Amino acid sequence: LKEIGGPGVQKLRAASISIVGSGALGGPCAMFLAAAGIGQIEIWDDDVIERSNLQRQIQFGERDLGKAKVDILAERLATDHPGTRISTRRKKWSPSDPLSGSILVDATDNFPTRYALNAAAHLSERLLVHGAAAGWTGQASVFASGCRDGAPCYRCWVPETPPNAAACDEVGVVGPVTGMVST
């Protein structure tokens, strides 16, 4: 693309992204970011691959069942995009854990972690890219509250956990919805 050119490619190579969650949202997101030439991707997740994940988590296959999501995703990214440095954290992210990325990606499925990532992004003056999906619906947003005065944050948009909120493991999610949100 003429809008990117050499300087744009250099910016992509210099960029660092932290993704919390490597399932149906975080996995494809990481794949597209690595393919775009992002220089460094940090991925956090404590989960293992289960058969029920496969219909929406396209980065995994039958051969990966029972293995750590971050390990398999990192192997795939390293093979397909060796120019991207991948670091993994096989644990659930908590607010006391430092995030190395200049941009934070919330690919989680629970409100406490979403709110904690929102606070981390705001306090550290970083962009927060948020995605969520359940059932037949999904949403994607970018929040710059820590970067621009007056810009709203995730908690401004969703001040408290909705009373009818359910995680996708409770209500299910259609695979193509996660594909649209994660890209």
Protein language model annotation of sequence segments:
Residues L1-T183:
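Adenine nucleotide-associated cytosolic modules
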